[in-house]
Amino acid sequence: GNEKQLIEIFQGVHPEDWCFGTYRSHLHCLLKGIPREQVMAEILAGHSIHLEFPDYRFYSSAIVAGGLPIALGTALGLKRQGKPENVWCFCGDMAAETGAFQEAVKYAWGFDLPITFVIECNGLSTNTPTHQVWGVPHQHTTIGETIWRTHTWAEGRVIRYCYDREDWPHYGVGQMVDFDQVGQAPTGERSDV
């Protein structure tokens, strides 16, 4: 999974910073300092893919690339108000290939906005290999990357890391988490899909 990379990235995220995540933001919430009981309550209430914690300046969207323009607007507002906070915008590799991402990076670069984009590349758009969607010959290689990598502004402002999905229970690996069992003694059995 991507736990190691996220732990490293969140060492640079401050409590006053703003975070915008994707539909897979459970760990992001915990690393931002949101109490696990609050995160778990939202997940169990059916809000797993759109976690919102305004008191912690944390927002997420289940729409691919949906958080990009909102994060960009937040960064623009912070700059206009002269505030010292930074915006952290997380997206997947498929979102990073969209026009919304390319435009957000270009606008942030042009106006030197306080935003860091983090591309979490697992080679998939939900379950479709990203490189096949765009006709790119190799996994973890993208066409859009060549655009923003040419800007010196992007150094440290566009972070891209790759990871492979492992055997942890989540969509696409054939295992699911049974939340009816949360808080009960583990049985040692896994539920296969």
Task: Place the predicted regions along the sequence by residue.
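Thiamine diphosphate
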Residues: F111-V193
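Cofactor-binding active-site loop characterized by glycine-rich and histidine/acidic residues
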Residues: N2-F111, Q132-V136
